[in-house]
A protein has these predicted regions:
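Mature catalytic domains of secreted/periplasmic carbohydrate-active enzymes
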Residues: 19-487
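Sec-dependent signal peptide recognition
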Residues: 1-7
Length: 487
């Protein structure tokens, strides 16, 4: 028994290094898998911008910034500064902190949020944990300016983490406070210029003290909730390398102790891509990126394009969002959709309607999205072979799963209209599906809600000619999916 115990003690450091035991060094951290398979399978997530900025509900979620722009740039964001003084009062009388008591979140229900996310087809979900404004949405011991002590007086992150995970989804939290110190410079004479508000308006703190608080907050989110995904906004170049290394090693070690495969997302070049996951805000590559990536995309549209709730929001349609999801997934990405709840914690009905319809499409045709991987090309413009075919062709995107290739049409080719899919050649199919020899088509199926339809095909070196059957009804007014099974 003593021999076994000694052997176990000798091997313990090696076991620790094999799983966990990350050091705050890039070489050690490079053992971390930046994008685990669960994320590549999940494809679609939802999060929210919800915070104090939803009280004024004007301009966008950066109201905190624009209300303080009292110089020549005071007209920024639809006259944000001038409007603030007209509606709420001058900055020497009314500061951003005065919105906090109005941010009550009295109708917030974490279970209702999680239900909405799940019904919309999300496989990971969460919310902003802290935006640029310095207000933490969890129960923090490092700042009095947090949702558990002020405003809602609830641990929003803790409640939502439990609700999301109880429904089998992965939990997401985003941190945007890396530029809180430099974002706004409050001036003497303003209501904000008071030491008691220093931890809200970071610029009033000593810089080293503020950096320590930045790391403490990040580590606190990890220790209390250990999200499956932590998203960092831009400006991580403002954080010293040592602190970034300290955070990553702490997070990865905590996750390993819980048996979780976690992700850190970043923008630009703020982290190495072999350790973290690259995020494109409102954008995506136009061809397949060999490394998985994230696209965060907000539901709002038009003049505001706000991430947080504002009065008079214009919205993208469910068709816009589904088409973006299809485009992103076909290029080896995953889509993160942002919603914008009101200050009371409820979602406007028009936002709920949009994501409900996203969910209808995903619950019906999600097999072409979830768990798929890129085909050899993401997209082509298929050409009809009849005189009345659409002159500029039909947009079709590709995904694949095992020996199945999905063609997702965002333009409906119609019935009995032969369409050439030039990228579906035997060589491309064999490469994509890892098949030896010349593949044969086993079945071609137009997916529909009530019944599926068998399609006619001709499969040759020039591609695959697809003809939808005469009796096929238009399966969806958003996008149609044809599944090709090969053998």
């Amino acid at each position: 028994m003593r021999i076994y115990l000694i052997a176990a003690l000798i091997l313990l450091p090696f076991a620790s290094h094999a799983k966990g035991g990350y050091k705050p060094e890039w070489k050690s951290l490079s053992r971390h898998v930046p994008v685990p398979e669960w994320m590549r399978d999940a494809k679609f997530g939802i999060y929210c911008h919800w915070g104090v900025y939803t009280v004024p509900a004007y301009g966008n979620e950066q109201y905190y910034y624009y209300m303080h722009r009292d110089s020549a740039s005071a007209d920024f964001l639809m006259g944000g500064h001038r409007r603030h003084e007209a509606v709420w009062g001058p900055l020497d009388k009314f500061g951003y902190h005065d919105f906090i008591p109005m941010f009550k979140g009295e109708r917030f229900d974490a279970d209702e949020w999680a239900e909405l996310f799940q019904e919309s087809g999300a496989r990971f979900a969460g919310t902003v944990a802290e935006h640029h404004d310095g207000f933490s949405m969890w129960d923090s011991r490092h700042t009095p300016f947090c949702a558990a002590k002020m405003g809602p007086k609830r641990d929003i992150i803790g409640s939502l983490a439990n609700a999301v995970r109880s429904r089998g989804m992965k939990f997401f939290a985003s941190l945007h406070h890396e530029n809180n110190y430099t974002y706004v410079k409050v001036k003497p004479g303003w209501a904000a210029y008071n030491p008691k508000y220093a931890k809200l308006y970071g610029c009033l703190m000593d810089h080293d003290e503020w950096l320590g608080m930045w790391l403490d907050k990040c580590n606190e989110v990890v220790d209390k909730y250990c999200p499956d995904i932590i998203y960092f906004d831009a400006w991580m170049d403002l954080i010293p390398e040592k602190l970034k290394l300290d955070f990553l090693s702490h997070y990865f070690n905590k996750a390993d102790s819980l048996g979780r495969e976690v992700i850190v997302t970043y923008k630009y070049e703020d982290f190495p891509r072999n350790i973290c996951m690259l995020d494109h805000e409102m954008a995506n590559p136009d061809k397949i990126d060999p490394e998985p990536w994230l696209c965060d995309y907000t539901i709002s549209a038009g003049y505001h394009r706000s991430w947080g709730y504002v009065k008079g929001m214009q919205l993208s349609t469910h068709k816009d969002i589904i088409h973006k999801l299809i485009e992103v997934v076909s290029n080896n990405g995953q889509l993160l959709l942002n919603l914008s709840p009101r200050s009371d914690g409820t979602f406007p009905q028009d936002q709920k309607d949009v994501v409900a319809n996203v969910g209808v499409w995903l619950w019906s045709y999600g097999e072409s999205i979830y768990g798929t991987r890129p085909y050899v090309t993401s997209k082509e413009v298929a050409r009809g072979k009849t005189a009345d075919a659409k002159a500029d062709g039909y947009n079709v995107y590709y995904t694949k799963k095992g020996k199945t290739v999905y063609a997702i049409f965002t333009d409906y080719p119609g019935r009995e209209n032969p369409v050439l899919l030039a990228q579906l050649t035997p060589a491309n199919v064999a490469e994509a599906c890892g098949m030896k020899g010349r593949p044969r088509i086993k079945a071609a199926t137009l997916l529909s809600v009530k019944r599926n339809y068998t399609c006619d095909t001709t499969f040759g070196d020039d591609g695959l000619v697809l003809t939808l059957p005469r009796n096929a009804r238009l399966p969806s007014d958003v996008a149609q999916v044809v599944r090709f099974d090969f053998e």
